[in-house]
C-alpha cells in the first residue's frame, strides 16, 4: 500500500465509524443525559481519584460523543475542548451543553491526528474510544504530544464485546459493564 492509498483507506474507515455513530447519536445522547441526571457524583469521584480538578484546568475530551464528560468537567470550572469525528454527536454535544448552561468548545477531529499545538492541555480524558481505534498507538502518541509536562491522561475503556466471546464471563453477569 502506498502512502496515498493508505490515507484514503483510513479516511474511508473513519467515515464508516462516523456514519455508525451518526446513526446512534440521538439514542446515545439520551443515555448520556440520564447519566448527567443520575451519575455525576460517581463520575466526579472517579476522576478526582486520579486527577485533581481545579478551575481553569485545560481539558481535552477525546471522542466526546454527546458531551457527557465535557459537560461534567465544564461544570467544575474546567476549560474543556471536546472532539469527535461524528457530526451528529457534535450536534448532540452542543445541544446538551446548552441545556446544561455550560460553554464547551466542540470540534470535529480525528483523535489519531490532533491539530492542537504541543503541550496544549493539562488533562486529557477519554471514555469508550480507544478500543475502537484502528491505530491506538498513534492516538496515544498524539495524546502525549498535546499534554503539558506533568499533565494527566485518564483513559476509561474496556473491551465491551468480551462477554460475547467468553461464555463463563457472560454467565457470571459481566455483560452489563458495571464491573469495568
Residue ranges of each PLM-predicted region?
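A short glycine-rich, Lys/Arg-flanked "PGG" loop and its adjoining helix->strand segment in the class I
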Residues: 137-152
Amino acid at each position: 500500500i502506498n502512502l496515498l492509498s493508505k490515507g484514503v483507506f483510513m479516511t474511508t474507515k473513519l467515515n464508516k465509524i462516523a456514519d455508525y455513530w451518526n446513526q446512534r447519536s440521538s439514542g446515545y445522547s439520551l443515555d448520556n443525559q440520564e447519566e448527567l441526571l443520575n451519575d455525576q457524583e460517581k463520575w466526579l469521584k472517579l476522576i478526582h481519584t486520579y486527577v485533581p480538578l481545579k478551575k481553569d484546568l485545560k481539558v481535552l475530551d477525546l471522542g466526546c460523543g454527546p458531551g457527557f464528560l465535557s459537560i461534567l468537567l465544564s461544570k467544575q470550572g474546567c476549560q474543556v475542548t471536546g472532539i469527535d469525528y461524528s457530526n451528529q454527536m457534535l450536534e448532540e454535544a452542543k445541544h446538551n451543553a446548552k441545556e446544561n448552561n455550560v460553554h464547551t468548545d466542540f470540534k470535529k477531529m480525528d483523535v489519531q491526528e490532533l491539530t492542537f499545538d504541543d503541550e496544549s492541555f493539562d488533562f486529557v480524558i477519554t471514555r469508550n474510544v480507544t478500543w475502537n481505534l484502528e491505530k491506538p498507538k498513534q492516538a496515544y502518541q498524539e495524546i502525549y504530544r498535546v499534554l503539558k509536562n506533568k499533565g494527566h491522561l485518564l483513559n476509561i475503556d474496556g473491551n465491551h464485546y468480551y462477554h460475547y466471546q467468553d461464555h463463563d464471563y457472560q454467565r457470571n453477569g459481566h455483560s452489563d459493564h458495571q464491573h469495568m
